[in-house]
Amino acid sequence: MKNFTCVQDIGNLKSALDEAFEIKKDRFKYVELGRNKTLMMIFFNSSLRTRLSTQKAALNLGMNVIVLDINQGAWKLETERGVIMDGDKPEHLLEAIPVMGCYCDVIGVRSFARFENKEDDYNEVILEQFIKHSGRPVFSMEAATRHPLQSFADLITIEEYKKTARPKVVMTWAPHPRPLPQAVPNSFAEWMNATDYDFVITHPEGYELDPKFVGNARVEYDPVSYTHLRAHETTL
C-alpha cells in the first residue's frame, strides 16, 4: 500500500482487521518497524483525536514524529495554482511539499473541504498535490471527502461489539448551526458498503450524500418534516 486515502487502498478488509486486532493485543509488537523513520503530520485544520491517536500509533511503531501546523508556526502557504504571489502567503504549497518530503519517510495530511468550489473539494486538490509531489507515502488524516482513519476505527469497533455475524448499521445525522464537511459520513458509508452489513442511511429528503458514497446502502427518508424536527428540537 503506497498511499491510504480510502477503503480501496487497504486491500483485503478481513486481513486488515485481523492485523488491527493483533496489534491491539500487543501495541508495541512492531516497535522496531519504525526505527530511524520519521512521520510528518501536516495539519491545515485543527484536530484532537486524530492528532493524538496518529502520533501515539507512530510512537508505538518506534517512529520519530514531526508535527507541522500550517498557518500556525509555519509560513502561510498559497494552495491555488497560477496565482500572483503578492498576497499574505509568502510560499507556495508546490514549493513547500518537496521540502517537507526531504525530512520524513511518511506524510499524514489533514485538509478539510473549503466550501468554495465543490469540484476542487471532491478532487482532493491539496491531498493529491502531496501524493504527486512529496515523493513519500501519504495517508489522509481527514480530507475534503473522506476520513479513512476514523472509518477504519469505526469498523473495528463494530466488529468488536457486534452481536450477530451480519449486523444492521444505521447512519443518520441531525441539524447543525453551521455547514460541516461531509468527509465523515462519506467515508463511513464507503467503508460500510465494503462489508456485508445490512447498512441503512436515513435522513430528511434533501440531505443526500453524493451517490458514489451512498453506494448500495438502503436509503430511508424520515417522514417527519424538517420544520417539525426543528420545532421539536427547540423544545428539548
PLM feature spans:
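Residue-level detector of anion-binding/catalytic polar loops
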Residues: N64-V65, N71-Q72, V106, P137, ...
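Positively charged, low-complexity intrinsically disordered leader regions
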Residues: M1-L48, L52
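Glycine-rich phosphate/diphosphate-binding loop of Rossmann-like nucleotide-binding domains
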Residues: L48-S53, E159-S225
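Short, structured coil segments at secondary-structure junctions
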Residues: L61, H133-S134, T195
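Anion-binding alpha/beta catalytic cores of soluble intermediary-metabolism enzymes, centered on
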Residues: K89, I97-P98, D105-W191
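Conserved small/polar residues in nucleotide/adenosyl-binding loops
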Residues: T227-T234
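Active-site cofactor/substrate anionic-group-binding motifs, chiefly glycine-
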Residues: L48-L94, V99
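Short, ordered loop/turn segments at secondary-structure junctions
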Residues: I70-G73, F112-R114, A143-A144, P204-G206
